[in-house]
Each structure stands twice: as C-alpha cells, then as structure tokens.
Swiss-Prot record:
Keywords attached to this entry: Acetylation, Actin-binding, Cell projection, Cytoplasm, Cytoskeleton, Nucleus, Ubl conjugation
Protein name, as recorded: Actin-related protein 2/3 complex subunit 5
Highest taxon, organism lineage: Eukaryota
Record GO biological process: Arp2/3 complex-mediated actin nucleation; cell migration; regulation of actin filament polymerization
Molecular-function annotations in GO: actin filament binding
Complexes and interactors: Component of the Arp2/3 complex composed of ACTR2/ARP2, ACTR3/ARP3, ARPC1B/p41-ARC, ARPC2/p34-ARC, ARPC3/p21-ARC, ARPC4/p20-ARC and ARPC5/p16-ARC.
UniProt region (Disordered), positions on chain: 21-42
Gene3D superfamilies reported in the protein's UniProt record: Actin-related protein 2/3 complex subunit 5 (1.25.40.190)
Origin species: Bos taurus
UniProt keyword Acetylation, yes or no: yes
SUPFAM superfamilies: Arp2/3 complex 16 kDa subunit ARPC5 (SSF69103)
Length: 151
C-alpha cells in the first residue's frame, strides 16, 4: 500500500494556490494606448448629416481595455452626443446597420448614459434601448451586464 502511495505522489506537485478563486490578478492588456473614438471624425460626419457614419465612427476604437476614467468619460460623451442628434425615425436603421458586437457596444454606452442622465438624454436613450433590444435580443443585455470590461 505504501509503495503505491509513494510512486503516485507526483500529482502533489501542483500548486493549488495558483487556482485559488479568492486570489485576484488584474489582467493588464496594455490598453493604455487607446484614446477612444476620433472626435474630429465624428463631428465631421455630424456636420455633413451622415448620422450612420457618425455612429460607426463613435463606436470605433472603444476604450474598453484602458483604466483611464477620463478617456472613458470622453468616449461616452461623444457617443451620447451622436445618439441625441439622431431623429427618432432613423434610429432603427442605424441599429440595423450594426453587427452583433456593435449592438452590444451600443448597449454598453446606453447603460453608461443611464448612469448619469443629462437634459432629455433618458428619453432618447430609452428609444435607442428599445431598438437595440429588438436587434440584439435579451442576450445583449445579459452580455452587457455580465461583462467585466466596461466603456
């Protein structure tokens, strides 16, 4: 019996502390270089009246991996500015132009806008939420609420 135990003791070389669920290691993906969406490109599209291109530009290069709250706030304000400038009739077309990841990202920005409401932004965000929910389904809400990386 003891011979069997000694020969099979190799399994004990695993460091069980490595798999401790209470040991948190923050993953650093090197996202400090992310500056968020290009505000000049977004403003240019808004001035030209190309709202869908403005939305695409605002959702491009999201600051998900950065820890800088100032960059995240600036990106959120750019996206909110684009969402508010849409007409109610054009919202559904714009949401339909996004892919699944784009709808999820849009939903993240919608919930970010709900966190700090400004003048009349809640009504507009609710319209966007309705259309994004129709396009992405309940799964997009679940993915946004359970995501560890925020915008």
């Amino acid at each position: 019996m003891s011979k069997n135990t000694v020969s099979s003791a190799r399994f004990r070389k695993v460091d069980v502390g490595e798999y401790d669920e209470n040991k948190f290691v923050d993953e650093e993906d090197g996202g400090d270089g992310q500056a968020g969406p290009d505000e000049g490109e977004v403003d240019s599209c808004l001035r030209q009246g190309n709202m869908t291109a403005a939305l695409q530009a605002a959702l491009k290069n999201p600051p998900i991996n950065t820890k800088s709250q100032a960059v995240k706030d600036r990106a959120g304000s750019i996206v909110l500015k684009v969402l508010i400038s849409f007409k109610a009739n054009d919202i559904e077309k714009a949401v339909q132009s996004l892919d699944k990841n784009g709808v999820d990202l849009l939903m993240k920005y919608i919930y970010k806008g709900f966190e700090s409401p400004s003048d009349n932004s809640s009504a507009v965000l609710l319209q966007w939420h309705e259309k994004a929910l129709a396009a992405g389904g309940v799964g997009s809400i679940v993915r946004v609420l359970t995501a560890r990386k925020t915008v």
